[in-house]
From Swiss-Prot:
The lineage of its organism: Eukaryota, Metazoa, Chordata, Craniata, Vertebrata. Binds 2 heme b groups non-covalently. Its cofactor is heme b. PROSITE patterns: CYTB_CTER, CYTB_NTER. The keyword Transmembrane applies. Component of the ubiquinol-cytochrome c reductase complex (complex III or cytochrome b-c1 complex) that is part of the mitochondrial respiratory chain. The b-c1 complex mediates electron transfer from ubiquinol to cytochrome c. Contributes to the generation of a proton gradient across the mitochondrial membrane that is then used for ATP synthesis. Heme b b562 binds at H84, H183. InterPro entries: Cyt_b/b6_C, Cyt_b/b6_C_sf, Cyt_b/b6_N, Cytb/b6-like_sf, Cytochrome_b, Cytochrome_b_C_euk/bac, Cytochrome_b_N_euk/bac, Di-haem_cyt_TM. This is Cytochrome b.
Length: 380
């Protein structure tokens, strides 16, 4: 029999082993769909971003009007812009659900895969941040000013670092130019790290909802999971297109319809919704350096999760106490997101402080303690 080109060709062989003949556990649920959805999000963002970059001008006097020009005069420019802006939101929705799945089912015990995933999250956050500055509206400018200014809290080198990042003494033309360069570059860096992420995952194979070895029962990725992923894609595409076509500005800030003005500060400076949980944690500490450290810790804490796993069972499937804590953590993050969008006044200050405290408490002490308790209860 003639050799199958899919299995013998050096390039096709890699694709085949990753997406076609890949042995996959027979019982992975829809929670395992988000990896492929994230890949689709990245591809969409790169494509729409490339088309937008063709019409964008990275200059303070032209940036705002170039975006307006794209929406008004370019064929389907409004659609490309709406898909790109709302695609970012769906990218974050998918990555949050993907991380939540990892926490619930103990996927973080594949340490290399988990760590590359955390690096991907950080790179994505950086990309989204620099991208938000590009339309050069009021919230773009002031959001960029406030967040970059946080680096000045670093002792001794802080102020120098901020001025170096800005390319001057305030957010101005050099800042916009370099942010555009970074925003163009970073998605390709994300694509590269994604390949590494996938490579580490395929070393061990996927985890499954039971958290036990699935070597005894594997099925080929195609047609089973390729079809399942297409269904997941259709289910994501529906709300995504509904949002982008019916209310494209729902998640945006009205302030961004006003061109950037360094002389007028908006009443409430806040980032996009997907950063609000971290922003709430930053604001809950009445000290600049402390707030910056808490902000960094709120994401970097994910790197500690594999070391805080004390249960003898991998997943939370059969651990009701840990499940309760997990959903408490989810509710807590939703509260933080809401508080981050509110002004800094009573009662939001105290709610934010309590939610920030419980966020770290649940992750650092309650989950490991409850894991140990469940071991005892099961006579492990």
């Amino acid at each position: 029999m003639a050799p199958n080109i899919r299995k013998s060709h050096p390039l096709l062989k890699m694709i085949n082993n990753s997406l076609i003949d890949l042995p996959a556990p027979s019982n992975i649920s829809a929670w395992w769909n988000f990896g492929s959805l994230l890949a689709v999000c990245l591809a969409t963002q790169i494509l729409t971003g490339l088309l937008l970059a063709m019409h964008y001008t990275a200059d303070t006097s032209l940036a705002f009007s170039s975006v307006a020009h794209t929406c008004r005069n370019v064929q389907y420019g409004w659609l490309i812009r709406n898909l790109h802006a709302n695609g970012a939101s769906f990218f974050f929705i998918c990555i949050f659900l993907h991380i939540g799945r990892g926490l619930y089912y103990g996927s973080y015990l594949y340490k290399e895969t988990w760590n590359t995933g955390v690096i991907l999250l950080l790179t994505l956050m950086a990309t989204a941040f620099v991208g938000y500055v590009l339309p050069w509206g009021q919230m773009s400018f002031w959001g960029g000013t406030v967040i970059t200014n946080l680096f000045s809290a670093i002792p001794y080198i802080g102020q120098t670092l901020v001025e170096w990042a800005w390319g001057g003494f305030s957010v101005d033309n050099p800042t916009l130019t370099r942010f555009f360069a970074l925003h163009f570059l970073l998605p390709f860096v994300i694509a590269g790290i994604t390949v590494t992420h996938l490579m580490f995952l395929h070393e061990s194979g996927s985890n499954n909802p039971l958290g036990i070895s699935s070597n005894s029962d594997k099925i080929p990725f195609h047609p089973y999971y390729s079809l399942k992923d297409i269904l997941g894609l259709a289910l994501m595409l529906t709300p995504f297109l509904t949002l982008a076509l019916f209310s494209p500005n729902l998640l945006g800030d009205p302030e961004n319809f006003t061109p950037a003005n360094p002389l007028v500060t908006p009443p409430h400076i806040k980032p996009e919704w997907y950063f609000l949980f971290a922003y709430a944690i930053l604001r809950s500490i009445p000290n600049k350096l402390g707030g910056v450290l808490a902000l960094a810790a709120s994401v970097l804490i994910l790197l500690l999760i594999p070391f805080l796993h004390k249960s003898k069972q991998r997943t939370m499937t059969f651990r009701p106490l840990s499940q309760a804590l997990f959903w408490l953590l989810v509710a807590n993050l939703l509260i933080l997101t809401w508080v981050g969008s509110q002004p800094v006044e009573h009662p939001f200050i105290i709610i934010g402080q309590m939610a920030s405290f419980s966020y770290f408490t649940i992750l650092l002490s309650l989950l490991p303690a409850v894991g140990t308790l469940e071991n005892k209860m099961l006579n492990y």
